[in-house]
Amino acid sequence: DDPEIRRLLVAAARDRSNPRAHENSVDVLAQECRSGRVCAKGAVRNALMVALRYDRSAAVRQKALEGLQPYIGDDMGVRDAVLEALLNDPDPDIRTEAIGLLTPVEADSSVREVLQTVANQDDNPYIRNVSREFLEQVSQQIQ
């Protein structure tokens, strides 16, 4: 809970010159967010969204995605970052996990639109199928 340590972790999460320190920092920040301790809107959450959107390492993007999960229902920026990952991440495991994280916001029309796009256009048949199944579940719950 030390603000100085948090500041250093955020700085290391943004600095890719030392890949191991970068990945470890994202991991620690993500763990803190999942535990609910230090991920209020601001630098930590933003660092995880940047890592999810732009990091070359799938492992780092995965950790960032996991850290953002508790905030998808409350933070439009997080929701948009997860939807962007679903549409654009090159790793099918990350796209698949992104679908699973959307449950708290499944009734949101923008979420359904993205899922429909993925169900129709994703290169990976498994992801298309998971998206269709998710949309079917949402349709049944709405009716």
Stretches found by the model and what they are:
Residues 1-7, 25, 64:
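PEST-like low-complexity intrinsically disordered regions enriched in Ser/Thr/Pro and acidic residues
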Residues 37-40, 56-61, 71:
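Mid-length scaffold segments of soluble, non-membrane domains
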